Amino acid sequence: MDGVIVNSEPLHKKAYYNMFKDFKLDVSESLYESFTGKSTYSICEQLCLKFNLSITPYELVNSKRKHFKYIFENDKSFKMIDGAFELIKDYYKNNLKLVLASSASMLTINKVFEKFDLDKFFVAKISGADLKQSKPNPEIFLKAAKISGHNKKDCIVIEDSTNGIIAANSAGIFCVGYKSKNSFNQNYSLADLVISNFNQICFKE
């Protein structure tokens, strides 16, 4: 969802760095970029191990989500990525089944879907936060394919992150790597197709 449907990454980054400040964590830009595509819990678990923290990952998660909630509700610049809404409508109109498979929490997913009125276009939503393994584990995409009712060879994944692309590749599902102006230091080498504009994958194409 983040980086493909909405550009909430700047909001998440603000929330994470506020959380880092709360707990006095010195997180480099390169370390932060390596988190892209992972669930909040997985990231916080990694932070606890790296910095040898005596607190639980859930304490970090709660701090980050508190900051994100405030930023989400007050940042007027938050909007959908150019062309994303048109692509969703195009696929829906042509009877393609859409399943959202995101590392974001279901709370965040529902907030985004409510804000942009997206529920009617999707047959299901999956949060990686509710699964045993986070991306780059393929579990989330295998579950999405199963929910769609189609063989995975007839499905596609649209991803903007290294971890998501690895997960799709490991699942054996055709992966479209979306390389946008907001994509930083992500590896698209395992993507089956790399695009920079959603017009490149509209239904007629």
What label would you give each PLM region?
Residues 15, 43, 83, 108-111, ...:
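Phosphate- and divalent-cation-binding pockets in alpha/beta enzyme and binding domains
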Residues 70-100, 106, 110:
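Short, acidic loop-to-helix structural element flanking the phosphoryl-transfer center
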Residues 11, 35-39, 79-83, 104, ...:
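Short beta->alpha linker loops
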Residues 1-33:
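Active-site neighborhood of HAD-like aspartate-dependent phosphohydrolases
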Residues 89, 105-205:
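Asp-based, Mg2+/Mn2+-dependent phosphohydrolase catalytic module
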Residues 21, 92, 169:
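Anion (oxyanion) recognition and catalysis
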Residues 5, 80, 98-101, 133, ...:
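Conserved SAM-binding loop
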Residues 37-71, 90:
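A metal-dependent, Asp-based hydrolase signature
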